[in-house]
Amino acid sequence: MELIEKHASFGGWQNVYRHYSASLKCEMNVGVYLPPKAAGEKLPVLYWLSGLTCNEQNFITKSGVQRYAAEHNIIVVAPDTSPRGSHVADADRYDLGQGAGFYLNATQAPWNEHYKMYDYIRNELPDLVMNHFPATAKKSISGHSMGGLGALVLALRNPDEYVSVSAFSPIVSPSQVPWGQQAFAAYLGENKEAWLDYHPVSLISQGQRVAEIMVDQGLSDDFYAEQLRTQNLEKICQEMNIKTLIRYHEGYDHSYYFVSSFIGEHIAYHANKLNMR
């Protein structure tokens, strides 16, 4: 992994690395925050998945996560949201193609050549982190919007691999909303049964479980009713007896002003779970 940025932050280092991804067949950037204690011991890892139009920079420059990661001794890994490059398929829209990988494995041309974000996040990236950084095997996952969707899907499909999961403003019923329908049709084809592998509410209804789910949702979020539908997740978790910490916040929107307001509580939540295991 090639170090391309290094910034001192809260006694640790906010770095950005570039590496070639065998899963995605392109060069990828990834942000890694190493708290002060990483200089002398191995620490657990939180993977953060960003939302539509984002890259590895949005979370590390806007959320203020470094302060809390330093306090709780957690390495934070923030990858890009899709494969990148002039040779990678793209679309002339913000919600498909580069910047909109949806953390799935595409099966349809031209996307299936590079868009294997599920494999990248689940397998390739953790292997790189374990090999290059002072990381323990304990890991948790979180994300925002499209990234919240990805975090929920990865945790629900791999409950033994992630100690805990949380999300900000996640897309919980993607096959029922425009963002998900358009992306899934392109990446996965018209067989809607295949879509359910990346549909958190459906995964839970089929019996996939995690110990607990934490979600924060702003009630002034312009996408709440049409695209996110947090209440669907709350309802199915109640029906399936999955413990939740779902909080609705008056006045907060979909932006990083919202994420930065509550990221400290998410880091504390994950730190508590990681230290219990």
Swiss-Prot record:
GO BP: any one term: formaldehyde catabolic process
GO CC terms of this entry: cytosol
Class of the enzyme per the UniProt entry, highest EC level: hydrolase
Taxonomic source organism: Escherichia coli O157:H7
Membrane-crossing segments per the record: none
Catalytic activity: S-formylglutathione + H2O = formate + glutathione + H(+)
Pfam families: Esterase
Keyword S-adenosyl-L-methionine: no
Active-site residues, as the UniProt record annotates them: S145, D221, H254
Keyword Methyltransferase appears in the UniProt entry: no
Record's protein name: S-formylglutathione hydrolase FrmB
UniProt KW keywords: Hydrolase, Serine esterase
Job description of the protein: Serine hydrolase involved in the detoxification of formaldehyde. Hydrolyzes S-formylglutathione to glutathione and formate.
Gene Ontology MF term list: carboxylic ester hydrolase activity; S-formylglutathione hydrolase activity
EC number: 3.1.2.12
Taxonomic lineage from the root: Bacteria, Pseudomonadati, Pseudomonadota, Gammaproteobacteria, Enterobacterales
UniProt gene name: frmB
